[in-house]
Amino acid sequence: RLFLKSGATAAIGLAVVPNTVLGKTYGHTAPSDKLNILGVGIGGRGSAVLDGLKSENIIGLCAVDWSYADHVFKKYPGAKKFNDYRKMYDAMLKDADAVMVATADHTHAIIAADAMAAGKHVYVEKPLTHTVYESRLLTKLADKHKLATQMGNQGASGEGVRQICDWIWNGEIGEVTKVEAFTDRPIWPQGLSRPEKGMKVPSTMNWDAFLGPAPERPYHSCYTPWNFRGWWDFGTGALGDMACHILHPVFKGLKLGYPTKVHGSSTLLLNESA
């Protein structure tokens, strides 16, 4: 809590102070020192992220599909349940220190921005936003409100990334002239057009909340969960899903800046799906 309130300078100091000096004998953290955290989008990746936050107070959880998120709600019986993040913010944001966002890509920016505008720190799953422009807006919000932020790019913290960077920087593999990066994505259904007919919205689903800023369309089970990644209105395709993992080591290791040229190709181009 002190770290979030005092910024990076205080954090550096706290990092080298033993727990006993801070009054946390044997590593025990008083309840008053724990962070109050809200989770938005908890059924998929959000569930794993929350597992890493178990040491803190998970006070509120929001999922647009309560059936998909039921196993997570059961993990945190003390957390209040919502199916619309706006209602959770209205009721609980004032009591929160930070918000975890792991919804479909197209709602990352608005959910994070609303929390940041209220002065709350955020952890947002990758891809950070649906568009580059949204990412720039969040950067401005973070600077304006002096917030701690993090994107969920777990691979960037792996030992393998640090090792390959050291190899490159130490010249152990010689001059790098070409890098090939590949992925098993997309592993969702491909080459789809929008369904001609919609389906009845499940009783456990808040479809309007899932759509968020996306254009209105009838509910269909092909959109969510998981497969939203393959629909442009909701996801960012294979590039948005995996480039942060497989290209980050390349950019870090070779210390690359913005690209000078990008070329893309596909055997099939569709307006609806990736």
Model-flagged regions — what are they?
Residues 1-11:
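N-terminal secretory signal peptides and thylakoid transit peptides that target proteins
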Residues 16-45, 51-53:
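C-terminal segment of N-terminal export signals and the immediately downstream linker at the start
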Residues 41, 172-190, 202-220, 260-270:
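NAD(P)-dependent dehydrogenases' Rossmann-like dinucleotide-binding region
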Residues 46-47, 108:
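N-terminal Rossmann-fold NAD(P) dinucleotide-binding loop
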Residues 58-75:
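NAD(P)-binding Rossmann-fold cofactor-contacting core
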Residues 104-105, 109-157, 171:
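Beta-strand-loop-alpha-helix segment that lines the small-molecule cofactor/substrate pocket
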Residues 140-147, 165-177, 198-201:
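Basic phosphate/pyrophosphate-binding loop/patch that engages nucleotide-derived ligands
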Residues 208-274:
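Rossmann-like dinucleotide-binding domain that binds NAD(P)(H)
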